[in-house]
C-alpha cells in the first residue's frame, strides 16, 4: 500500500509550431500550440479544465498520461490568458491538482506606424513642406509602439542633403541630423518594412518629410524712367526734374522700405510696393550734379531670412544749366577778326566752342547772311570749325538759342 497525499501540479508552455513562445511574449502568430505537463499520471484532465480569455481552444489531445496539447487561436489583437484552476483533475490517489501558473500571451498583428518631425538648432519646429535657411535640422522618427531594426541606411534622401548621427532618443523615437548640400527641396522617407515591433510586424506605410533649404541671398536691381515714362539708363545725364526708380528683388520680401535706400545728391520719396518683388520710389535732385542710388547689403530679407546682397550703384547726373557757345574768327593768316569789323578777307575761319559736350550740333544750326559755308568740321564734342566765304557788304554768322542741347 502506498500512501499519497501530494497534489499533482501542472505546467503550461507554448510554441508556434517550431519555436517556443515564452510566457508574457508578444507575437503575431495566428495560433499557438499549448502543452500541459502534469507532475504525475492523471486520467481525468480534459479540455474543459482549461480556462482561456481572448481566444478559443481546439484539437485537445493526450500525448501521454502526463502530457496534453491543444491549439489556441486568438479572437482579436490583445492580451490572452490560459489557466488551469485548482482541483480540476486528480491523480491515481484522488488528490486534486494545484492551480497552474497562468500563461500570458499577447497577440499583435498591428503594424507600427511612423511620423517624421523636425527642429532646427534653436529647437524651433520645422514643419514638413516648409522652407528655411537652417544649416542643419534634426529629424525625429516617432513610432506608434516600440520598434527595432532602424539603421541610417533605412532613410531614403532625395535632393541635396546628407544624414548623420542616428541616435535612439527612446524606445519609440530616433533622431538623425539632416545637412543640406545645396538649395532646393529635400525629401526624406522611411519606406515600408524598415522597422519591426515586438511581434515582428513591419511598418507597412512610409513616413515622409519634405523640407526646402534656401541659402540663396536675394539680389536687387535699380532702374529708372522719367515723368514721360522714358527709360533713363545708368550713367546718363538729363535735365529731368524727377526720376521714378524701380527696385526689383530676385525673390519676395516684406521688409524693404524707404530707409533701406542710400542716396547722394537727391531726395527719395513716395515709396510704394507694386508687388512682393517690385517697388517704386521718386528721386528728386537737390542741385545740378551727380546723383547716386544704391541699396547696401543686409538691408532686407527673403522669406527664409537670408540677407540681401548689395545692389549695383545707379548713377545719374542732373543738369539744368543751358550750354553756352562762343564764336571767334580769324583770317587765312591767323589774324583775329573782331565782330563788327570790316576786312577784305575772301575767307574767314570761325571756331565755335561750347562749354560742355554737344551731341546734336550740325551745319543746319548755323544761320548766315550774305555768304556761304565752305566747310563744317567737328573737331570734338565741344569744338567745331567753319570755313566761311563772305559776300560784299555785311556778313553775319550766328547760332540761335535752342539750336542744340
Where are the language model's segments positioned?
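Non-catalytic beta-sheet/beta-sandwich ligand-binding modules that flank or precede catalytic cores
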Residues: 1-405
Amino acid at each position: 500500500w502506498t500512501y499519497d497525499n501530494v497534489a499533482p501540479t501542472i505546467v503550461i508552455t507554448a510554441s508556434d509550431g517550431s519555436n517556443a513562445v515564452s510566457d508574457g511574449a508578444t507575437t503575431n502568430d495566428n495560433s499557438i500550440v499549448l502543452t500541459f505537463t502534469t507532475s504525475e499520471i492523471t486520467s481525468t484532465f480534459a479540455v474543459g479544465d482549461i480556462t482561456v480569455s481572448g481566444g478559443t481552444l481546439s484539437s485537445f489531445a493526450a500525448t501521454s498520461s502526463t502530457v496534453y496539447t491543444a491549439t489556441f487561436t486568438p479572437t482579436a489583437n490583445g492580451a490572452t490568458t490560459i489557466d488551469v484552476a485548482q482541483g480540476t483533475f486528480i491523480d491515481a490517489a484522488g488528490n486534486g491538482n494545484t492551480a497552474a501558473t497562468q500563461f500570458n500571451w499577447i497577440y499583435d498583428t498591428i503594424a507600427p506606424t511612423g511620423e517624421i518631425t523636425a527642429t532646427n538648432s534653436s529647437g524651433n519646429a520645422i514643419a514638413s513642406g516648409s522652407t528655411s535657411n537652417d544649416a542643419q535640422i534634426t529629424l525625429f522618427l516617432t513610432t506608434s509602439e516600440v520598434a527595432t531594426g532602424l539603421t541610417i541606411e533605412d532613410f531614403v534622401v532625395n535632393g541635396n542633403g546628407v544624414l548623420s548621427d542616428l541616435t535612439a532618443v527612446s524606445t519609440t523615437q530616433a533622431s538623425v541630423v539632416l545637412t543640406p548640400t545645396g538649395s532646393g527641396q529635400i525629401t526624406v522617407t522611411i519606406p515600408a518594412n524598415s522597422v519591426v515591433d515586438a511581434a515582428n510586424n513591419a511598418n507597412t506605410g512610409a513616413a515622409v518629410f519634405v523640407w526646402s533649404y534656401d541659402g540663396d541671398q536675394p539680389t536687387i536691381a535699380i532702374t529708372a524712367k522719367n515723368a514721360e515714362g522714358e527709360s533713363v539708363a545708368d550713367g546718363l545725364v538729363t535735365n529731368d526734374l524727377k526720376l521714378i526708380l524701380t527696385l526689383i528683388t530676385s525673390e519676395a520680401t516684406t521688409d524693404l522700405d524707404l530707409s533701406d535706400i542710400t542716396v547722394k545728391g537727391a531726395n527719395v520719396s513716395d515709396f510704394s510696393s507694386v508687388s512682393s518683388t517690385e517697388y517704386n520710389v521718386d528721386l528728386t535732385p537737390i542741385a545740378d550734379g551727380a546723383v547716386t542710388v544704391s541699396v547696401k547689403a543686409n538691408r532686407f530679407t527673403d522669406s527664409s531670412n537670408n540677407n540681401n546682397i548689395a545692389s549695383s550703384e545707379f548713377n545719374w547726373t542732373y543738369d539744368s544749366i543751358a550750354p553756352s557757345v562762343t564764336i571767334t574768327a580769324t583770317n587765312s593768316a591767323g589774324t583775329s577778326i573782331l565782330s563788327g569789323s570790316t576786312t577784305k578777307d575772301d575767307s574767314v575761319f570761325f571756331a565755335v566752342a561750347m562749354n560742355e559736350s554737344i551731341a546734336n550740333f550740325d551745319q543746319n544750326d548755323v544761320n548766315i547772311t550774305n555768304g556761304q559755308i565752305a566747310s563744317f568740321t567737328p573737331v570734338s564734342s565741344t569744338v567745331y570749325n567753319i570755313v566761311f566765304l563772305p559776300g560784299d557788304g555785311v556778313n553775319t554768322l550766328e547760332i540761335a538759342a535752342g539750336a542744340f542741347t
